[in-house]
Curated annotation (Swiss-Prot):
CDD domains: ENDO3c. GO terms for molecular function: 4 iron, 4 sulfur cluster binding; class I DNA-(apurinic or apyrimidinic site) endonuclease activity; DNA binding; DNA N-glycosylase activity; metal ion binding. This is Endonuclease III. Its EC number is 4.2.99.18. Keywords: 4Fe-4S, DNA damage, DNA repair, DNA-binding, Glycosidase, Hydrolase, Iron, Iron-sulfur, Lyase, Metal-binding. Its cofactor is [4Fe-4S] cluster. [4Fe-4S] cluster binds at residues 198, 205, 208, 214. SMART domains: ENDO3c, FES. The gene is nth. GO terms for biological process: base-excision repair, AP site formation. HAMAP family: Nth. Binds 1 [4Fe-4S] cluster. Residues 119-138 form the HhH domain. The lineage of its organism: Bacteria, Bacillati, Actinomycetota, Actinomycetes, Mycobacteriales. Belongs to the Nth/MutY family. It comes from Mycobacterium leprae (strain TN).
Length: 245
């Protein structure tokens, strides 16, 4: 299959990437951030806690955290041992607790206790890197951003949108292919697809809506009936219906 794409032009790549995004929009019409939050501060905290953890584990942990710590000042003044105990289930709790306390301090001292809405300012916050900043901008403030997590990077390389490994380079490469107003939604769609269909070890190729545009089609079972059991998540019925099953 690799030879099929060896002569793809830049224009051809742009058209294919945008066509794949439209197909993903049909497959996942109601994408969203899978971290639970009600404010920019809650999303920032949840995203920091999600490092080396799962969204499911974070969502089980944050209700108690958000009830106890309601403001940046609360985090700044938190008893470290108590905070560590709250967030222990997410892993690396000592480092994360230190980051959250310093985050609260930075927000109180420099931003009047509010999470800023620019990449430049977000970058200055403890525990906030580019991926976290894009999550916050896109989901708390409606500012388009591409979130390059493990799933996103793996899939766009599998699709040959880019060969880059560095997340920042991946972000820029994909940003040149897809319309800016689609960046946040694209991020969710790709992550949903990676978690539900395009698995790392055994993708469900035979029921994938991207099959005709995917250079890696065939990495997983191509027979629909063999691929169908691999599809995960609450959208499984919809995805299988799109595949004619």
């Amino acid at each position: 299959m690799a030879r099929r794409w060896s002569g793809e032009t830049r224009l051809g790549l742009v058209r294919r990437a945008r066509r794949m995004n439209r197909a993903l929009a049909q497959a996942f019409p109601h994408v969203y951030c899978e971290l639970d939050f009600t404010s920019p501060l809650e999303l920032t905290v949840a995203t920091i806690l999600s490092a080396q953890s799962t969204d499911k584990r974070v969502n089980l942990t944050t209700p108690a955290v958000f009830a106890r710590y309601r403001s940046a000042l609360d985090y700044m003044q938190a008893d470290r041992a108590e905070l560590e105990n709250f967030i222990r289930p997410t892993g690396f709790f000592r480092n994360k607790a230190a980051s959250l306390i310093r985050l609260g301090q930075a927000l109180v001292e420099r931003f009047d206790g509010e999470v800023p809405s620019t990449m430049v300012d977000l970058f200055t916050l403890p525990g906030v890197g580019r991926k976290t900043a894009n999550v916050i901008l896109g989901n708390a403030f409606g500012i388009p951003g591409i979130t390059v997590d493990t799933h996103f990077g793996r899939l766009v390389r599998r699709w040959r949108w880019t060969a880059e490994e560095d997340p920042v380079k991946v972000e820029h490469a994909v940003g040149e292919l897809i319309e800016r107003d689609q960046w946040t939604l694209l991020s969710h769609r790709v992550i949903f697809h990676g978690r539900r269909v395009c698995h790392a070890r055994k993708p469900a190729c035979g029921v994938c809506v991207l099959a005709k545009d995917c250079p890696s089609f065939g990495l997983g079972p191509t027979e629909p009936l063999l691929a169908a059991p691999l599809v995960q998540g609450p959208e499984a019925g919809h995805l299988l219906a799109l595949a004619g099953l």
